[in-house]
Design a protein with these regions (language model features):
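Beta-strand-rich interaction surfaces with strong enrichment in secreted/lumenal proteins
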Residues: 34-37, 132-136, 211-212
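Proteolytic processing hotspots in large secreted/extracellular or virion-associated proteins
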Residues: 114-185
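Surface-exposed intrinsically disordered loops and tails
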Residues: 24, 160-166, 198-201
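Short, ordered beta-strand-loop transition motifs
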Residues: 1, 119, 123-127, 137-138, ...
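Hydrophobic beta-strand residues in large extracellular and virion-surface proteins
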Residues: 3, 23, 104, 131-133, ...
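Non-catalytic accessory/interaction domains
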Residues: 1-113, 144
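Proteolytic cleavage junctions
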Residues: 51-61, 67-81, 156, 169-228
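Exposed aromatic-hydrophobic patches
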Residues: 43-51, 144-151, 205-214
């Protein structure tokens, strides 16, 4: 398989070189192989020979490298609710009669920008974070999810301050919050169909939660609708 690894910056002065990165490939039967690749600069491209057809790939599964991505993985065999603190996400499995492998990652850096002009003009995408949901799901797997947003959370790393705060220090109205989704990095962001915004108190205090009434594999982030 052909692989391309992109290095992005989070509070770092430059791209790093000679970084050992573990990359794990998994097939539909959950067979895994993990390799270490030394990465330098923004892009590292290579070809990896595998004895199976991979349907999932992820980096740094054992957290040996300290970076701006924190994730958790789990095997789901029944209906269950899991608070995934490292992923800043609550997973609610509502139906599972078989077994599913789930991995959720939280990226503490800016998502790729919106490419389409009319979407870019209408929405301000989060400059600070996004999520990735991946896995090998059974045919019976059905789940929802939840995560918290806060525009005034210094203790939590100010993850949504830039998105939610207006120049005068006040907050955007939470009615203008939307969730964006895309299946993978080759696709454009679009407004996700299955979410609700739940304010905690005032709609202009910059805190609340997002409920994802369905979850699908892909990347998720927040955006604010620009005023006309």
């Amino acid at each position: 398989v052909d692989v391309s690894i992109q290095q992005k910056l989070f509070q770092a002065p430059h791209m790093f070189t000679d970084v050992p990165v573990e990359i794990t490939f998994m097939d539909a039967n959950w067979n895994q192989q993990t390799f270490t690749k030394v990465c330098s600069g923004e892009y590292t491209n290579f070809t990896q020979l595998l004895p199976f057809h991979p349907v999932m790939v992820y980096l740094n599964g054992d957290d040996k490298l300290v970076n701006a991505v924190t994730g958790e993985e789990l095997i789901v065999k029944s209906n269950v609710t899991k608070n995934l603190n490292y992923a800043y996400f609550t997973l609610k499995v509502e139906n599972e009669s078989d077994s599913s492998f789930v991995r959720i990652e939280h990226y503490r850096l800016a998502p790729d920008t919106i490419r389409k002009g009319y979407i870019r003009d209408a929405l301000l995408i989060s400059p600070n974070r996004y999520w990735k949901i991946d896995g090998i799901f059974s045919n019976s797997f059905k789940a929802s999810g939840q995560f918290i947003f806060s525009g005034k959370d210094a203790a939590g790393g100010n993850l949504d301050n830039e998105l939610l705060q207006l120049p005068n220090g006040q907050m955007h109205n939470e009615d203008s919050l939307v969730v964006l989704w895309r299946a993978n990095q080759s696709e454009e962001w679009s407004v996700y169909d299955y979410f609700t915004v739940v304010s905690q108190g005032s709609k202009t205090d910059g805190s609340g939660r997002i409920n994802l009434t369905e979850i699908h594999k892909g990347e998720y982030t927040l955006a604010i609708a620009r005023k006309p």
